[in-house]
A protein has these predicted regions:
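N-terminal "cap/leader" segments of large eukaryotic alpha-helical scaffolds
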Residues: 1-30
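Flexible loop/turn segments at the boundaries of HEAT repeats in alpha-solenoid HEAT proteins
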Residues: 2-6, 34-44, 72-80, 109-120, ...
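Eukaryotic acidic, Ser/Thr-rich intrinsically disordered low-complexity regions
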Residues: 2-6, 121-153
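Buried hydrophobic core positions in alpha-solenoid tandem helical repeats
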Residues: 12-14, 48-50, 80, 84-88, ...
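Short inter-helical turns and helix N-cap capping residues of alpha-solenoid HEAT/ARM repeat scaffolds
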Residues: 20-22, 56-58, 94-96, 132-133, ...
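Residue-level signature of alpha-solenoid helical repeat scaffolds
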Residues: 30-31, 66-70, 104-107, 142-147
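Helix-adjacent hinge/juxtasegments
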Residues: 52-93
């Protein structure tokens, strides 16, 4: 039986999303994304999702980032603009997968917030490719180049 996530308080939902059972958290994450795709019901939870960006695991950090970015299309209060430094701090994460997910998510952010392109560009130059294995640093460099191209348009 599928839980009705939209009836949960922010605190209850965040508890589920930060559950130590990663499989359960992943399932809930996918359901939240499905809901965000169709509705702004979780926009009031933006700050709670933003708090996940500083989470203990890379999964938590990526979730928080991706939820905030997904909510950009409903962002009537310019919360993304205010949270941008916190969100983009993940571009310095120790996990290369986190960097790649963030870079990919930024593409959808600028679709709804094109005014942020010039603010995002300088952050891309702060990514230290030297701290990742060559196989990953090559992929991250490619992601950065593609995103810079998109942001420069």
């Amino acid at each position: 039986m599928r839980m009705e996530l939209t009836k949960l308080s922010e605190k209850e939902l965040l508890k589920l999303l930060t559950n130590k059972n990663e499989q359960e958290s992943y399932k809930i994450t996918n359901e939240v994304f499905e809901i965000i795709e169709k509705s702004d019901v979780f926009y009031p939870y933006f700050d709670g999702f933003l708090s996940l960006v500083e989470g203990r695991t890379s999964f938590m950090r990526m979730r928080g980032f991706a939820f905030c970015i997904a909510l950009a299309k409903y962002d009537t209060e310019n919360k993304i603009e205010k949270a941008l430094p916190t969100l983009l701090s993940l571009l310095k994460d120790d996990k290369p997968t986190t960097i790649r997910v963030c870079l990919s998510s930024i593409k959808s952010l600028v679709e709804f917030k094109p005014n942020l392109k010039k603010e995002i560009l300088p952050y891309l130059d702060t990514i230290d490719l030297g701290k990742y294995k060559e196989s990953m640093s090559h992929l991250i460099a490619k992601d950065i180049a593609q995103l810079k191209n998109l942001l420069s348009r």
